[in-house]
A protein has these predicted regions:
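Extracellular glycan-interaction patches encoded by glycine-rich segments
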Residues: 111-136
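Short surface loop/edge beta-strand patches of beta-sandwich-type extracellular domains
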Residues: 1-12, 67-72, 122
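Short tryptophan-centered beta-strand motifs in secreted/extracellular beta-sheet-rich domains
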Residues: 76-94
Length: 152
């Protein structure tokens, strides 16, 4: 883990990364916000599908659980991606564009997400890649802010 759990808001926020995979080798490479359990987690990852960025979101032991996917042109080149979470307002952003949404669901309870890891919550699926920037915002950003943040 890294940072301070005081900098993470479990009820709303944005996980932002400017990242590139070392290879498009069809393996999961994850960055996660979690609490060390399967109950509540946000996993931003290059998936086992070629050139695909995904988010797995799970809150309150599965009261809300979904996956958002988007195909990028090349995961070995730097991409700016962001995932916004807020009750009934979830979105994946990539290179200046909102690419996938989920419009219903609850978020984790306050002070639930406590760790930021370059792997899955259980220590698997290490992120093998390059990182220029990684940030967690304590509030859900507006569409205009996310456009600006993720534009290359």
């Amino acid at each position: 883990g890294a940072g301070s759990s005081d900098l993470i808001n479990s009820t709303e926020g944005v996980l932002y990364a400017e990242i590139a995979a070392l290879a498009d080798d069809l393996t999961n490479k994850q960055i996660s916000l979690n609490n060390g359990t399967t109950d509540d987690r946000i996993q931003l990852y290059y998936s086992a599908s070629s050139n695909q960025i995904s988010v797995f979101y799970k809150s309150q032991s599965g009261a809300t659980a979904f996956i958002l996917n988007h195909t990028l042109s090349d995961i070995t080149q730097f991409n700016k991606v962001g995932f916004k979470w807020k009750q009934n307002d979830f979105a994946l952003w990539s290179n200046g564009v909102e690419v996938a949404t989920q419009t219903s669901g609850v978020t984790s309870s306050a002070d639930t997400l406590t760790k930021l890891d370059f792997q899955q919550f259980n220590g698997s699926a290490d992120f093998y890649g390059k990182t220029k920037c990684l940030a967690v915002f304590k509030e859900a950003l507006t569409d205009a802010e996310l456009t600006c943040l993720t534009t290359t």
